[in-house]
């Protein structure tokens, strides 16, 4: 499997890094928190050959360059929309994993004509939708990073990423109910997102389909 070349596209306040592969309808791939576009390299080369795949690095992740004091899922979604506009893309499918799934929910609401069909893997709209043990882990990591910051270490990027997992993303039930795009939600049998929360999201989105994958967890769904 070859190492896909990183390309860049300039936005007004960021330089988005991405890998492009294949030919066919556009398929945008969105990674999770503290990951990068590289998690999709194998799929781009082996599984999605019938598509022009575009795996993006979100702000504060991978090789994307930006100077931010805060990261938000909504801002990530705005970057994806602007990216597609600047690439001249009029229609694209989306697969988003974890935080990428959260981005996909925003895209479904904001731009259903541009993104008519989306797959959101293990999304959550509320921080409280995370299993309590995992949420405590994130909170402990945040305290550790704040302690290291006081000692003079540069933990800004880590703290911004942790804030994403400890903050509601900003989509209400009414927002989800207004989604017009076709949305499929996938989650793991042993997911770190509460099953009742994922079912709540699916129930709020008109016509959304929901699949649970057996014998896997959030990290290998």
Which ranges hold each PLM region?
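Hydrophobic, aromatic-rich cap/lid helix
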Residues: 148-174, 190
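Conserved alpha/beta-hydrolase "nucleophile elbow" surrounding the catalytic nucleophile
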Residues: 33, 92, 96-101
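Flexible "cap/lid" loop of the alpha/beta hydrolase fold
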Residues: 102-110, 118-145
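Conserved alpha/beta-hydrolase "acid-adjacent" motif
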Residues: 192-197
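Active-site loop/oxyanion-hole signature of alpha/beta-hydrolase fold enzymes
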Residues: 54-93
């Amino acid at each position: 499997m070859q190492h896909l070349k990183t390309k860049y596209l300039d936005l007004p306040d960021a330089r988005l890094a991405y890998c492009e592969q294949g030919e066919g309808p556009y398929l945008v791939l969105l990674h999770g928190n503290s990951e990068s576009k590289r998690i999709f390299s194998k799929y781009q080369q082996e599984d999605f050959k019938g598509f022009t795949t575009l795996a993006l690095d979100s702000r504060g992740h991978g090789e994307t360059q930006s100077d931010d004091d805060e990261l938000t899922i909504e801002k990530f979604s705005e970057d994806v929309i602007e990216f597609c506009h600047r690439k001249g893309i009029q229609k694209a499918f989306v697969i988003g994993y974890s935080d990428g799934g959260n981005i996909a929910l925003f895209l479904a609401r904001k731009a259903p004509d541009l993104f008519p069909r989306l797959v959101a893997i293990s999304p959550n709209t509320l921080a409280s939708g995370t299993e309590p043990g995992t949420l405590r882990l994130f909170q402990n990591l945040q305290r550790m990073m704040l302690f290291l910051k006081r000692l003079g270490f540069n933990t800004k990027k880590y703290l911004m990423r942790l804030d994403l997992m400890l903050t509601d993303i900003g989509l209400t039930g009414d927002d989800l109910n207004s989604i017009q795009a076709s949305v499929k939600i996938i989650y793991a049998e042993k997911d770190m997102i509460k099953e009742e929360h994922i079912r709540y999201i699916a129930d709020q989105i008109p016509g959304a389909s929901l699949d649970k994958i057996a014998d896997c967890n959030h990290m290998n769904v």
